[in-house]
Amino acid sequence: TMAEAVAPRLETITGGRVYLRIISNLAIYRKTKASAIWPAKFLGGEEIVDGIIEAFAFACADPFRVATHNKGIMNGIDPVVIATGNDWRAIEAGAHTYSHWKEGHSSFTEWEKTDDGSLKGTIEIPMAIGLVGGATATHPTAKTCVKILDVKIPGGAAELSQVICSVGLCQNLGALRALASEGIQRGHMGLHARNLAVQVGAKGKEIDILAEKLKQSGKVRADKAEEILAEIRK
């Protein structure tokens, strides 16, 4: 709307003709930064901290790895953007373009060890988030999510951006910690086991019991889940 509004004025000033009346999703003047420090003892020790930093270095050095590294970060960011009625596609486009436009590496995050051996993580990406107008102001679910976050309207867009970036940083920490220890497949398999438990009709405490027995069996399948559920209920 703003681009279309100023187009005639620009034509008058320049004597030219305006063709594209649209803004860019590369919002470099609306970058948001979040950082945190985790003591090594809360992550599993110094070896895990070193493993996370090595995984980060791999992402910095290899385009195939950084694609998955950054995608994992967006696994955390996108749901919050969607839940609050914002445009996740615009945020995705801006973040990925910015990662290649900026100087240095293409990772959205940076990880380093502090002097006392703790792990410090930082994320900085464009975050064109809004709270006035659009679905955020009209969609009942989006309004409820914003209320849960206790973000003020108007004036809370910067705070919401910080929340979203913090989620992305924590998501990346979780993924890198898993990769630096037992591997990410173990966590995925645990989630798959729980989903199967619910799918075959497990209720309440049965879900955790069934999921654990499924993992122990090494056969995380629907038919095995049904068999174990029947045994639990005997």
For each of these PLM feature ranges, what is it?
Residues 1, 12-15, 19, 26-28, ...:
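Metallocofactor- and cofactor-centric catalytic cores in central/energy metabolism, strongly enriched
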Residues 2-138:
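Glycine-rich anion/phosphate-binding loop at the beta-strand->alpha-helix junction
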Residues 185, 192-234:
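N-terminal charge/polar-biased segments
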Residues 1, 11, 39, 151-152, ...:
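General structural signal for secondary-structure boundaries
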Residues 59, 98, 152, 183, ...:
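Alpha-helix boundary/capping residues
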